[in-house]
Amino acid sequence: MVQLLSAFVSLLSVVAVSGAAIPAPAPEAVVDVAPETATIEPTGNFTAQACMYICGSVCYSSSAISAALNKGYSYYEDGATAGSSSYPHRYNNYEGFDFPTAKPWYEFPILSSGRVYTGGSPGADRVIFDSHGNLDMLITHNGASGNNFVACN
């Protein structure tokens, strides 16, 4: 034990005399992406965007919502629909949500995959917008009874 202590003291004196610094280990980066969306870009950079809405367990960033809203409103303005679907179509608000804009309202799918809806299966989640393209709310079939909707958080 005395030899070990002596060796340690000798090592400390060598470091002190030489002026060499012993670097502290770099702290590990802790990245908590919930409730955020996270992507690794082709450049290798990590990006995260905060959730604007959460539908069930799906986080939607403002950029994902804007993409769905803009596409839905574009179809609406053109009098067109996504593929052979009926979207966007009028949303009647049978659930009685309190929207910030006046009716008529329209619904358009927002996909959990991050892609913009162009037809096919619409999934459970929707952006609701007015006839001027203003976002009102995100709603989902997840957690609702029958074919009803509940508000996303």
UniProtKB/Swiss-Prot annotation:
Keywords: Disulfide bond, Endonuclease, Hydrolase, Lyase, Nuclease, Signal. Residues 21-49 form a propeptide. InterPro entries: N1-like, Ribonuclease/ribotoxin, Ribonuclease_N1/T1, RNase_U2. GO terms for molecular function: lyase activity; ribonuclease T1 activity; RNA binding; RNA endonuclease activity. Disulfide bonds join 51-59, 55-152. Its EC number is 4.6.1.24. Gene3D superfamilies: Microbial ribonucleases. Pfam families: Ribonuclease. It catalyses: [RNA] containing guanosine + H2O = an [RNA fragment]-3'-guanosine-3'-phosphate + a 5'-hydroxy-ribonucleotide-3'-[RNA fragment]. Residues 1-20 form the signal peptide. The active site is at 89, 107 (proton acceptor), 141 (proton donor). PANTHER family: EXTRACELLULAR GUANYL-SPECIFIC RIBONUCLEASE RNTA (AFU_ORTHOLOGUE AFUA_4G03230). Belongs to the ribonuclease N1/T1 family. This is Guanyl-specific ribonuclease N1.
